[in-house]
Amino acid sequence: MKDTKSKKEGSKDLKQITDFIYEMGIHARTPRSGLWFLGSGEQSVAEHLFRVAMIAYALCHLTPKADKNKVIFMALIHDIGEGRVSDLNYIHQRYGRLAESTAVADIAKSVPFGAEIESAYIEEQARVTLEANIVKDADQLEWVATLRAEEEKGNSKARKWAEIAIKRLKTPGAKSIGKSLMKTHPDAWWFDMKDSWFVDRDPKDKNWKK
């Protein structure tokens, strides 16, 4: 009897995880709606979640006391409900966010590890713990980086929006990164005017092997 019950539970877990995998794919097709009001730019919820997670990971380097694993997991799931209710921008949020909490609760009920998801989501929303504040800061820094890219492409509203987002930052590390983002061109990581490669592209400069 125990073996039969175990097999049934295992089969149920596999079905739930399979459905979860497919559901997570919808975030790549769910647009971030704040850019509609900005008037330029496109971004999916999945793109946002990925960069938030990477920023949160980097912020842990500046805040060694933080639980890195908790931070990364929290960052990955902080907008998980948006696949069901869509992204809610600041105008939408004036009229409530209850649907998103319900969506996360329903997702949690549908998978064997749902308690972890719901607990992390609730902690992130409360923004009391160090880890939750780091994730929220990462969320804002991702938005700042997105806005800076739009500013450099010519959107005259983006700068003011970014300046407002900077004011929401809580942790010292995030505030320092925010200042750096505001004065660094989005292409600076790859485009170096002092690098002769961008002028003559001489293979000799790169020591390529034949």
Q: For each of these PLM feature ranges, what is it?
A:
Residues 1-210:
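Alpha-helical, largely C-terminal catalytic domains
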